[in-house]
């Protein structure tokens, strides 16, 4: 009796919503594929991150100073306002660490 009851409930669910069964089967298949190939997938994704980081480092090193072409009176005015564009020492290290942490969170 219980077996017939469970089979009738399963049959009712399949007739009512067959896409649920299809989604469950596809989820099981994809989950088993990911589980069996997880290490390869992890290596593939981490390899892409390292390549992207190298490309970003090259791009950062190629960036030019935006105030390089500014005239001397503009630079003097920026200096009087305290907006000099040179960053050195501890400030430079702090900004580099900040940039690395922001770029790694993407």
From Swiss-Prot:
Main localization of the protein described in the UniProt heading: membrane
Instruction: Note the topology in the membrane.
Output: Single-pass membrane protein
Signal peptide boundaries:
none
Q: Which domain of life is it from?
A: Viruses
The UniProt record lists the keyword Membrane: yes
Q: Which residues cross the membrane?
A: 5-25
- Compartments, record wording: Membrane
Sorted alphabetically, the keyword list is: Membrane, Transmembrane, Transmembrane helix
The answer on whether this UniProt entry bears the keyword Disulfide bond reads no
GO CC annotations on file: membrane
Q: List the disulfide bonds.
A: none
Report the sequence similarity comment from the record.
Belongs to the nanovirus U4 protein family.
Query: What is the protein's given name?
Result: Protein U4
